[in-house]
From Swiss-Prot:
Residues 14-31 have a biased composition (Low complexity). It comes from the Eukaryota. Disulfide bonds: none annotated. This is HssA/B-like protein 55. Residues 1-13 have a biased composition (Polar residues). GO terms for biological process: sorocarp development. Belongs to the hssA/B family. It comes from Dictyostelium discoideum (Social amoeba). The gene is hssl55. Residues 1-31 are annotated as: Disordered.
Length: 87
């Protein structure tokens, strides 16, 4: 992610961003740099929601992951695009 796109993600947290969300061992969700952007966009608070969806090759599905600093997050889904919302 370039600095410009990172700044854009931070300043416009509810806009869809094209970053890959990948599962890690089927139990831990790795949201990469976009997770950091979402966290920063929400002021570094304790929680935020991260909604993702993917459409392609005849497959349409959506997924929503909630992150909490105390509980962490988990998932086993790989998704291609996402939107974060401060809570």
């Amino acid at each position: 992610m370039t600095i410009l796109s990172a700044i854009t993600s931070i300043s416009r947290p509810n806009k869809s961003s094209k970053s890959v969300v990948s599962s890690n061992g089927g139990s831990s969700l790795s949201m990469g740099s976009n997770s950091v952007s979402c966290f920063n966009a929400c002021g570094g608070g304790s929680s935020y929601s991260y909604s993702s969806s993917y459409s392609g090759s005849g497959l349409d599905y959506s997924y929503k992951a909630n992150y909490s600093s105390s509980n962490g997050y988990n998932s086993s889904v790989v998704i291609a695009s996402s939107t974060c919302h401060c809570s």
